[in-house]
Swiss-Prot record:
Membrane-related topology note: Lipid-anchor; Peripheral membrane protein
Cofactor(s) needed for function: Mg(2+)
Binding-site list for GTP: 23-28, 39-40, 42, 45, 71, 126-127, 129, 156-158
Primary localization: Golgi
Keywords: Acetylation, Cytoplasmic vesicle, ER-Golgi transport, Golgi apparatus, GTP-binding, Hydrolase, Lipoprotein, Magnesium, Membrane, Metal-binding, Methylation, Nucleotide-binding, Phosphoprotein, Prenylation, Protein transport, Transport
Binding site for Mg(2+): T27, T45, D68
Regulation: Regulated by guanine nucleotide exchange factors (GEFs) which promote the exchange of bound GDP for free GTP. Regulated by GTPase activating proteins (GAPs) which increase the GTP hydrolysis activity. Inhibited by GDP dissociation inhibitors (GDIs).
Superkingdom of the source species: Eukaryota
Gene, per the UniProt record: Rab6a
Stated name of the protein: Ras-related protein Rab-6A
Species per Swiss-Prot/TrEMBL record: Mus musculus (Mouse)
The keyword Metal-binding appears for this protein: yes
SMART domains according to UniProt: RAB, RAN, RAS, RHO
Protein family (similarity comment): Belongs to the small GTPase superfamily. Rab family.
Amino acid sequence: MSAGGDFGNPLRKFKLVFLGEQSVGKTSLITRFMYDSFDNTYQATIGIDFLSKTMYLEDRTVRLQLWDTAGQERFRSLIPSYIRDSTVAVVVYDITNVNSFQQTTKWIDDVRTERGSDVIIMLVGNKTDLADKRQVSIEEGERKAKELNVMFIETSAKAGYNVKQLFRRVAAALPGMESTQDRSREDMIDIKLEKPQEQPVNEGGCSC
């Protein structure tokens, strides 16, 4: 059902696929966004998980479909089909693991192979709460994002740092948003997250 700001238009749905190596925090970022919580017990995602969240923006309501992919090699063959019809690819690395950062180039290449330029890509350096173990500087992250022409942000799913800002920036760039290239408007978007009213739909047998 549309909010008043939608002017009678149907609720628009956008697919976000989360990509990256195992244990970089993809599931934790989604959990923090959905429920504002963090689970200290690590459990690998099996296959693909699916959750959705309604976001109330300043002038419209959108439905984000969040697809959480497994980082393990044995599930890699599943991922291209989920990238294929995505609007946004969120490519995550662990700032304490330089290999996970290096592998983001491959993930971004995979996205562009499937989607060409018709996709929003956000590079995310997660786990800033472990700054004393940092192996990848924020400058290195910014440099790679600039070289690959993607968006960039650092986050901490554990501390909740910049997680809402991550989704604000993605929302500002969604198709149909005015001035999608005007980064100065990103902080002006007011996002209200609904409380989960129903059991989220999961695929893949893991809700971690």
